[in-house]
Structure formats: structure tokens, C-alpha cells
């Protein structure tokens, strides 16, 4: 649903740049309907169910027992993706939501010999950069500063890239940390030397969050998601080209919620609802962290507005609160359409994607192949000059099965074309075979007649290369064909 909403918004914004007055109002009406469905039903009800199921464990320990945890990424999650690789590159993309990461994985799965593994983990509350980035580093303990301005990993600061590299080198002396742009700006020789000399490299990428966090650009966040998909796939390919045996692991510090329409006033909590706002340690549109002693000021009625989150993973002395569903804390400035920091699935579920390339001939190597079509109709006899042939795309165009465009045409035994040429796309991704049926309409060429004895063939060829993939034998029992073009 999140992915469908994102793609719908992106498509709608594209239509606004095309002059078509007839479609403008109907398109707006459809988008408004979908907006109401997403905001008032999906986000509200799905996260109400999620909160109801999880709030007890959040209050007790701050996380759900069972799913992988972001604060255990380095010691418990990362090793399961590394295998025997000598070099591991961790790409951390700020605000890479899980459903966006699935698009990255789908793109990488189309690589020859590319192997992709997709998993997820739960982010640490509050789901913000200042907490998520330290959680992804090696540590025994995280500690929130008394004023909430930074998080320490085993007593070491983590706010900047050099500081994160210092934390990494504390456990892996050859480790490096740098921005993805800095890595790509290196000369090829420098990149290869870096990966050869380092067993562990953290690359930091930031496209989604830097777009969404600004009021002037927050409505471009879904375009930023599309750019991020392409950039991360290209970055992973580059790493595996620079170091063929490397393992790439992509993850994020947090996700986000975005809605085209701003919230109503009733969906925002102000100071009357928050009697302890005089002393917040951390405060955002979707999260609140206060000293333990401030919690006593909260009434029983107000407690029902929030989800209580144990903050033990960030040290003692703090209590966390997140608004339920898609409610925001009212704060001046910032953005209202793009937010994160809370406990919704969209904010809390972060991806973990493993990618590596297998050498040709190895047991892990899987080559790509084109999606194929075959004739579904049992009959092989044509009795009308205007007719249809039903075909089926044999596999969904997913992973190593790539979309392909074909040309279909009827020929005689000498290879002369006796029908028009029909384009057929094998690009359907549905796992339901009935949704992969292709209907091809043909019109026979004008002629004196067709021989019922002579064989005719339905020929399928790749449109790009002209290579014949298959041909099926048919009988054409039509005494004449029309001389006029009826538009088929």
C-alpha cells in the first residue's frame, strides 16, 4: 500500500506537467479519493492494530521481541550477510523506507550473477538520524546525553562521519567511513585501493531525508525516492566492480511518513495536551523524550493519547512517548507532510539488503533471461481474415526474468508474411497466470486465397534483435482476405 501510494503520487505529479484539460479534474478526483483512503483508513487502522499489538512490549523494554533490532545490527545482523567475504561495504541511506528498498532489491536482482537477500529490522526509538546512525555502529552500550543533543556509542561521539569512523576503527582497525559522493568522486585506482586495504567500509547516502526535511522540497520526497533507487543500485554495482568479491549491505537509520495533504488541527497535539513540555530532552513532530520525573505531570487521560516507550537502550533516566497512528506534535517550523521519529511501521521498519556478484560458473551464479510467451489457444486453424490469438507469459517478469518485447506475424512456408505484425509485451509481474494472458489481434493480408494444404506459421521474434524464438504451425482456411484496412 505504501509503495502504491508513492507511485500514484509520482505519476500524478507527472500528469500535471502535461496539458490535458479533459483529464485534469478526473485525475484530481481519483488522487483525492486515494489520499483519503491512505490517510484516513490505511495509515490510521493499520498502525492502530500495530500499536495495539506492540505497546505492551514497547512500555516494558522499548522493542518487540523476535524481529531483528537495529541496535544489534553490527554484532548480530551484519555477520549473517557477510559470509566469507574479505571486504564488506555497508551503505546507510538516510530515511530509506523498507518499501523503497524493495525497489532497489528488484533492480539489483536483474543483474547477471547478482544475488540479493532482503530482510528488515526494527529501528530504535525515536526513529531519527541522531539515534539510528549510532545504533548501526559497533557498541556495547548507547547513551543519550543529558540534554538530548547527541548519542554516545561506548562513550564515543557519533554525530559526524569522522566520529563514526573512529567508532568503527575501535573494533576494526582498517575500517573507513565516508560519504557515498566522496567515494564516487575518487579515481578508480583510489576506490580499488580503499576496498583492498579495508575489511569494512561504511558509505553514507542522503537523498530522501535531505529532501523531505525542508519545507520547500518536502513534496518532492517521492521523486527523491525514485532517484535513490537508481543511485543505490548504481553504487552497489560500482562497489562490486571495484572489489569483485565484496559484499554490499544496505540499510537505513529510519523510515518516514509522507502524505500529500497536511493534517487537520484535530490530528495535532499542542501544549495543553503536553503538560511536561517545559523540560523535553528530545522533541519532534513524532517523538518526545523527557526526564523520568516529568512523567508524573501527565494525567491518566493524556496517557491514552500517547504510546509509552521504555528508553533503557539509551541509558537511564528518560521516558519516551510517541503519538498514536498518524498524529503529530504541534511545533513551529519544520515540515508537516514529511515526518519521522515515531513508532509507526513506516518509520520503524528499516530494510537490510545484501548484494553480491557470483562469478560465472560458480554455484551461486544465475544468469538473466527474457520473459517468454507461448500460444495458449488450443486451436491451430484460422477461418476468418480478422482473428485473435491468446498467449500467456510463462513467468512473472521479476528477478532474473527480464521484460521483453516480441513481434508476432504469420508467414507461409517460404517465410513471406501473410498478416500484419503485432507487438506483444512480456512485462507482466503478476504471479497470477490469468493476469499474464496476452491477446494478439491479427488481420490477414489481401490475397487471392490461402491454401488449406500448405502450412502456415505463427512466428515469434524478439523485437530488438529480430531473433526468431519459436514458430507454431497453423492451417489457414480462408478463401479471401479484405483489401481494406479495418484498423486491426
Regions found by a protein language model. Name each.
Residues 1-488:
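Feature captures the catalytic ectodomains and active-site-proximal regions of enzymes
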